[in-house]
């Protein structure tokens, strides 16, 4: 099944809730802000919120639920974070133990949900500026990589920054920086342009998360901070349980992309 266009955020979430869409959400419900998900027990919530505050590039906070509540009331009233994402990951003691399409049985009265800004949000703006987005063109997930850039520690939370990569034609790199800089609450400007080895990526065609994409002659790899960073942190910190979105399978909010733009 494919999404019809145009589609509202609520319509997209309903299809996802009905398991009619279990694929990555890049290009889905264009114009609506997408978000990364992290779910943790209440006892870890403050430390993780502090981690996000100290690392706003990879972890820009859009909403935080009340303990036990699965409704992100600020960005999508009435939504249910237990069922409204296409695919979830469950980490136990730092190990990825399963992927599933709902987390109803895992969300108890102590769970707190965090929604973090996602770079899929500014892809609509890139396309509107005539800048190609390769993983959308190739109908796959965006490539994501662990880097040698350390995040600022907060309590128990520490680990490497994860970045997403999009190949950009040389002539459009400056424009891509300008366009994405307008969206600081969804990662904003790139954190690196060019040689991936400088940030600890040794094989650009072997991403740690997502899928490899074609890099054509005349294109430069451009890297943005990525909301998959908490998953890399989970592998380092090893909390008893951390639930996240599966990379590329995002939560679609009711916010419009341009609501998060500046200038």
Swiss-Prot record:
Keywords: Lyase
Pfam families given in the database record: D-Glu_cyclase
Root EC class: lyase
The enzyme's E.C. designation: 4.2.1.-
Domain of life assignment: Bacteria
GO molecular function: lyase activity
Family statement: Belongs to the D-glutamate cyclase family.
Name this polypeptide is given: Putative hydro-lyase GK2103
């Amino acid at each position: 099944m494919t999404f019809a266009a145009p589609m509202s955020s609520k319509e997209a979430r309903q299809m996802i809730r009905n398991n009619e869409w279990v694929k990555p959400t890049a290009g889905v419900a264009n114009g609506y802000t997408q978000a990364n998900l992290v779910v943790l027990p209440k006892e870890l919530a403050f430390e993780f919120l502090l981690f996000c505050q100290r690392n706003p590039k990879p972890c820009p906070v859009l909403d935080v639920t009340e303990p036990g509540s699965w409704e992100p009331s600020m960005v999508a009233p009435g939504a249910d974070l237990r069922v409204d994402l296409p695919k979830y990951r469950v980490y136990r003691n730092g190990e990825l133990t399963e992927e599933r399409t709902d987390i109803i049985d895992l969300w108890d009265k102590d769970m707190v949900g965090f929604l973090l800004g996602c770079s899929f949000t500014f892809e609509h703006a890139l396309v509107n500026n005539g800048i190609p987005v390769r993983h959308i063109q190739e109908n796959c997930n965006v490539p994501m990589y662990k880097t040698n850039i350390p995040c600022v520690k907060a309590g128990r939370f520490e680990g490497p920054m994860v970045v997403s990569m999009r190949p950009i034609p040389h002539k459009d790199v400056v424009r891509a920086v300008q366009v994405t800089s307008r969206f600081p609450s969804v990662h904003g400007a790139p954190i690196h342009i060019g040689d991936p080895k400088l940030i600890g990526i040794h094989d650009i065609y072997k991403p740690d998360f997502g899928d490899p994409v074609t890099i054509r002659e005349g294109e430069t790899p451009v890297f943005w901070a990525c909301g998959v960073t908490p998953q890399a942190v989970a592998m380092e910190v090893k909390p008893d349980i951390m639930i996240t979105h599966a990379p590329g399978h995002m939560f679609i909010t009711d916010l419009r992309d341009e609501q998060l733009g500046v200038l």
